[in-house]
Amino acid sequence: PKTILPSIWRFKAMQPKIDMLIADPLKRADRRFLSLVNGDTPKDNPGALPGIFLGIQAFKSGEHILPHRHNSFAIYHIMQGTGYSIVEGERITWERGDTFVCPAWAMHEHFNDGTELAIQYFVQDMVGRAYERNLMWEEPVGHFGHMVKGGFRPHNPELGD
């Protein structure tokens, strides 16, 4: 197996891409996010580490990411902003520095009720699930998807490398 070396993604370097990201309008349950990929991970299993996805999600004041769910867990760390998430009916109020988890297949949605951009870092096991061909999601509610072929594309192709 290939050796996976440590990686760092500097916020200063990502800031211009986050600025481009927030110019992209939200559609349906869509989200604006950047994928942080370690170049040492295999091309057919790209992620921060094998099987682990690391991303940055940004949404503007007043925006709402519609209810959705997936069979990968999600750990969210709030880097900026204030708001709340509804996870399986439970309201989780968050602000800068907070961390919360969303279990696999838990219905969840996010709200930015603050006055500034909300930035969430999130970790998921979706890369491993996609590699195993068992990644599933439901978004918007009632519309199922299933990852049957490998490969990942950036949310906005202009943000990709």
Q: Predicted segments — roles?
A:
Residues 60-62, 78, 87, 93-114, ...:
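Conserved metal-binding segment of the jelly-roll/cupin
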Residues 1, 111-161:
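Double-stranded beta-helix
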Residues 13-66:
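A short glycine-rich, His/Asp/Glu-containing loop-to-beta-strand
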Residues 68-70, 108:
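Histidine-centered divalent metal-coordination motifs
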Residues 1-18:
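Non-heme Fe(II)/2-oxoglutarate
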